Amino acid sequence: MARFRSVFALSALALAASALAACTPAVSSSAPRDPFASPIVPGQSARASAGGGRATIDAPSPRSGSGTVTVALVGGAQLPTETAQAFTEATGFTVAVVSIDGVGSLPKTSADVVLGLDGADAVAASAAGTIASTAPRDTSTLAGTAVEGAAAAIAYGRDDVCVIADKSWLSANGRSLPTSFGDLTSPRVRSLLVVPDPTSSSVGRAFVQEAAAQTGEGLGAFAQSLSPRIDPSLGAAVGVWTAGGHVSQGYVGQLVGGEAEASGAYPLVVAPRSLAAAAATNTGADSYGAPVSSTCIARILYAAATASPASDGAESLIAWLQGERAQRLLATAGSAYPIDGGVAADTKAAWLMGISGDAVVPDETVASPEAITAWLATWNSALSAPASTQPEGEDGDEPAAPSPAPVVTRPSAPDPGTDTEDED
């Protein structure tokens, strides 16, 4: 009887095991051994992690060769080390990088190619003869990205210029996140903003263009009410941002005037959207910085050779940047939103840069040089004679600004370190 019970029990176990196997999916051989070894991020999937979405640009193959390609990065553009190494592995060319804040400095670089031009930069550089006059070989000009008057400019990404807010600082100090240009001049927000000098920085100039578009003839009055701190470069501006210490060293290292782990007393900074990706939290799924969308100006990133005919290395890099591998690497690092939106899924660019919809939009920086000159003159004139402002706390029952209060500087701002005695 005991033997019968034992045989019956074993048979029952075998039947149960067979039933369980029939209703339990097999574990994929590609599944991670420890599913919690990597941070959980929104929308993460095995397919996306393995290679991302399908590319949509019909990019030609870049040519191979040897030698060094000197790359000028303008307007906060990034070419991460991993991306440069991948280019070298694919083509044989090595890369040397030099950073500049505006296209006016391009002739000093002896660069073979420039990355990070926006439409206004491309037009100005083409008129000055500092980029090639013809399009490079082996590249594709995507519909909607051609820049009239700058045939050499080839789109490879997007990185709008916005006001980037330090969410933690605003929350800790009882301030609301600005939602419009008008909010920037409110008593509890004005004088909290730092802007890279628009006369020398492409990023600062783009911000003035958006301010002019939103305020029209009121640009001067807006600038007076805003009363921002002006720093000589994007790197210096990021260095006095209250969340500056959270920005990755790789990002800061490719900014003019950048200083790793530097932070200051200004919770609002004018910068590219990619700054939010560079200030990601440890999870990689959130950021210390939030782009204020209503302040953004759409900015396409262009690459251009600096000479005609372009060197093989320059044309190879431009062609490679349009390929799926490069587009995915830029998006993964959050260095740019890929112009090929099909590869953006499950990347820092998709999670943190705040861009939705089509990647290709009209470049809003494109304007006549005369208009840009007039806007900058109005801006600088207004800041040289700022309007008087009432002390904070007079707009109702709201308290005055907490210490430290930023010290406002003018377009000819002194060394950004001069205000550090007010920073706790």
Please provide the spans of the model-predicted regions.
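Early extracytoplasmic/lumenal segment of secretory-pathway proteins
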Residues: C23-A124
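Ligand-binding pocket segment of bilobal, Venus flytrap-like solute-binding proteins
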Residues: S200-V203, Q209-P291, T295
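Periplasmic solute-binding protein
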Residues: G119-A128, G149-S176, A206-Q214, A298-A304
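Periplasmic-binding protein-like
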Residues: V189-T199, W320-V343
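A bilobed periplasmic-binding-protein/Venus flytrap-type ligand-binding module shared by bacterial periplasmic
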Residues: I164-S171, A298-G313, W320-L321, L329-A333
